[in-house]
Regions:
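Chalcogenol-based redox active-site neighborhoods
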Residues: 1-162
Length: 162
């Protein structure tokens, strides 16, 4: 897949899951470095936001926005995955007061490769948002082709309301 960062074109390795696909089983890690298998089988929809680094302006804005929106969608689980270390994520969450979503790190393992979001030239994952139904099927996906841009919140939040 093609993405850009400040206009410079780069390629991901592989293809991300598309609408209609069952999301692949992947592992990310929580603040205690415990493996979390995604998608979770909680019987809820899942909004999965993948961001390059939580310590950048756009990733921070996006994650805080989803943390705020989680209050309006109690029937939806919100998870953000980034390439950051657990220490960076803990520090960011403490500073920003983010408590309504789960922040997972994918700085080890094969999350980026399995999801098709690895951008080797960038050294991080591409920015993408997925909404999965209760069975783990992708019902919405948005690859943010300009990595330094935010996703289309109105469009994806409308999808959550369905």
């Amino acid at each position: 897949m093609k993405v850009t960062r400040h206009g410079n074109e780069m390629d991901t390795v592989g293809e991300a899951p598309k609408v209609g696909d069952i999301f692949p089983t992947v592992i990310a890690y929580d603040e205690d470095d415990q493996a979390v298998t995604l998608p979770k089988n909680t019987g809820k929809k899942l909004l999965l936001s993948v961001v390059p680094s939580i310590n950048t302006r756009v990733c921070s804005i996006e994650t805080k926005r989803f943390n705020m929106e989680a209050d309006n969608f109690k029937e939806v689980e919100f998870i953000t995955v980034s390439d950051d270390s657990k220490e960076d994520q803990k520090n960011w969450c403490a500073a920003e007061g983010v408590t309504n979503l789960q922040l997972l790190h994918a700085d080890k393992g094969d999350f980026a490769e399995v999801t098709g979001l690895d951008v080797p030239e960038f050294g991080h994952m591409a920015r993408m948002v997925f909404i999965l139904d209760e069975t783990g099927r992708v019902i919405y996906e948005e690859l943010v082709t300009e990595i330094s841009s935010e996703p289309d919140y109105a469009k994806l939040l409308n999808e959550l309301k369905k």
